[in-house]
UniProtKB/Swiss-Prot annotation:
Species of origin: Burkholderia mallei (strain ATCC 23344)
Pfam families reported for this sequence: Ribosomal_L27
Key words of the record: Ribonucleoprotein, Ribosomal protein
Protein name: Large ribosomal subunit protein bL27
The UniProt record lists the keyword S-adenosyl-L-methionine: no
Length: 87
């Protein structure tokens, strides 16, 4: 009688799916209008010129151009700007 004893149960074995947050287009790279620049939780980075913010705080380009990351003010807030491409 070749029986196998029942395996014990484990309280592990779960993990949440990654949310794929972070910078999608880096400084100096070209981007088209509507392109996602940063996916984030909260305003870790703020929208500057030619950058819009979605309801989930995603930053996206409003015009075609190049991405530029800057820091502003005494608090050194990170701001994302899109420099428009020469028409």
């Amino acid at each position: 009688m070749a029986h196998k004893k029942a395996g014990g149960s484990s309280r592990n074995g779960r993990d949440s799916e990654s949310k794929r947050l972070g910078v999608k287009v880096y400084g100096g790279q070209a981007i088209n209008a509507g392109g996602i620049i940063v996916r984030q939780r909260g305003t870790r980075m703020h929208a500057g010129e030619n950058v819009g913010m979605g309801k989930d705080h995603t930053l996206f380009a409003l015009v075609d151009g190049h991405v530029k990351f800057t820091t502003k003010g005494a608090a050194k807030k990170h701001t994302v700007v899109v420099v428009p491409a020469a028409a």
